[in-house]
Amino acid sequence: MIIGLGVDIAEVPRIKAAIERRGQPFLRRVYTPNEIAYCESFKNKFERYAGRFAAKEASMKALGTGWRGGVRWVDFEVQREQSGRPILALTGEAAKIAAALGVRRISLSITHTESQALAQVIFED
């Protein structure tokens, strides 16, 4: 059964501007070291950052809490299976809340163009 569903669109130019303006403090607040390393390995890194940003926003919506109760951006980490399929790992307060809700399966889909990134997250029991 679906416990939560979240969808988000991130504007690539907006994410690029935030990274260029705020630099490392912004990156460290929003992205995990693994996510930063992954995005930086691509020529189109800002599209990758925007995709992960959208995934984190969509995850927060699926969780149903907003950015309150101690939930942080880095509590949501986008990882990849060997096949390249994106998966979502939860830590910290996000993991505690998901466990309390009975979340046992998380589905994540991310797509992007040069200007936008979209992510959808489904939490299931």
Task: For every predicted segment, state its role.
Residues 1-125:
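Core catalytic alpha/beta fold that binds nucleotide/phospho-ligands
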